[in-house]
From Swiss-Prot:
Species the sequence originates in: Bacillus mycoides (strain KBAB4) (Bacillus weihenstephanensis)
Coiled-coil ranges from the UniProt annotation: none
Full protein name: UPF0346 protein BcerKBAB4_2120
Family recorded in the similarity comment: Belongs to the UPF0346 family.
SS bond list: none
Gene3D superfamilies from the UniProt entry: YozE SAM-like (1.10.150.260)
SUPFAM superfamilies: YozE-like
């Protein structure tokens, strides 16, 4: 069974060393409207762009690349 992007990112919460990806994971956790069941890049990317959660979408792109590598 594949993990959703949200489920994958939860392992980055409460990281020992804070970085942009761990900050994104915390923000996703706090956002009750985040599309938690999605595995679709376009759905998640659009949501993040419209929500204004990120200063730069490159943070999401980096997190997505890690997600794809570990699937």
């Amino acid at each position: 069974m594949k993990k959703t992007f949200y489920h994958y990112m939860m392992k980055h919460r409460a990281a020992l060393f804070k970085n942009e990806i761990s900050d994104l994971a915390e923000a996703m956790y706090d956002d009750l409207s985040f599309p938690k069941q999605s595995e679709d890049y376009d759905v998640i990317s659009s949501y993040l762009e419209l929500s204004g959660m990120l200063e730069s979408m490159s943070i999401f792109d980096d997190a997505w690349d890690l997600y794809i590598q570990e699937r």
